[in-house]
Amino acid sequence: MEIATLDEIVKQSLDFFAGSRPPSLDVSGFSYPFVIGSGNASHTGRIIFSGRAAIIGDESNFKALAEAYKEAIAQKLIRDTVVISASGEKDSVWEIEFAKSLGLKTTLLTCKPESSAAKISDTVYSYKSIAEPYTYNTSTYLGMILSASHENPADIKKFIETVSLPPNFGSYEAYAFVLPDTFQSIAPMVEIKRDELFGPHVMIRANSQGISRHAKFVHPWEHELVISVGNENPYFGHTDHRWFIPLPANAGFGLVECLTYYICGQIQRAKPQYFKEHITGFCTDYGPKAYGKPEKFEVIVPANG
């Protein structure tokens, strides 16, 4: 089975959205909502609602958050729950049901308008996506981010194609991203890609510039490449193993996500193909079993639209 690398999927996603723009999402109509998602869906919610008052949560803490804010719910200070789920299945179904049991209006952002969660949500924003390997979720969440940021996908692709890898890029054992504070929410998305693509085999870490000052670079190492995005880096990592990537003045979350994912895809190309070796076993065996489901996951998630 042909499994595309992450950098390929990034470029394919940008080409797709250049020709099929996602729906425009105006978050100003939500007043202090719960924004719930799993993994990178939660981080996508944080990005979409950046600069606005919102309560960001996930499947692990949604009920605890609802309990903590029960007085605000009772007083109608909180009226909405936004659930973000590419599949519209798994945890998103009970999250919608739970929000409705609290008397909250529910809005679902999904790539599957016929999904179980979509059938019960009050409002559904449906996003198109390309076919891509399970867990990548690049076009899925990128479409949602672009719908709020209104960045130009063609301009993003043009920028990342100007990025030249430093010599011996693939020989490093570890990679560290230092991101502008504005784009802090991208950092955990990068680390989720590390888990999915490499597991314990390759070290990739990502932090904002501010968080990087908190003892993240106590150990300079010639086998770690420190990748500074948007800001020069005079302090962190071995002095001979730093890579600075300037950003265009109008850079948004979509560009920074695509850039970091693109670089992760280049690392994927340079290393043994851990993901390709293991993803089929995960999707057909212990992955769905962990959810108590007999159905297998699709190794290649089909396109929507």
Regions inferred by a protein language model and the residue ranges of each:
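Cofactor-/ligand-binding subdomain signature composed of acidic, glycine-rich
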Residues: 1-21, 136-137, 279
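A short, well-structured juxtamembrane/interface segment
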Residues: 14-29, 157-171
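Anionic-ligand anchoring segments at beta-strand to alpha-helix junctions in alpha/beta enzyme folds, i.e.
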Residues: 23-78, 169-214
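Glycine-rich phosphate-binding loops that contact phosphosugars or nucleotide phosphates
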Residues: 29-160, 230-246
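Short amphipathic alpha-helical segments and helix-helix/interface helices
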Residues: 93-97, 166, 191
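Internal, active-site/partner-interface "lid" segment
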Residues: 146-172, 276-298
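Internal helical hairpin/lid segments
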Residues: 186-267
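Charge-biased C-terminal accessory regions appended to nucleic-acid-, cytoskeletal NTPase
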Residues: 252-305
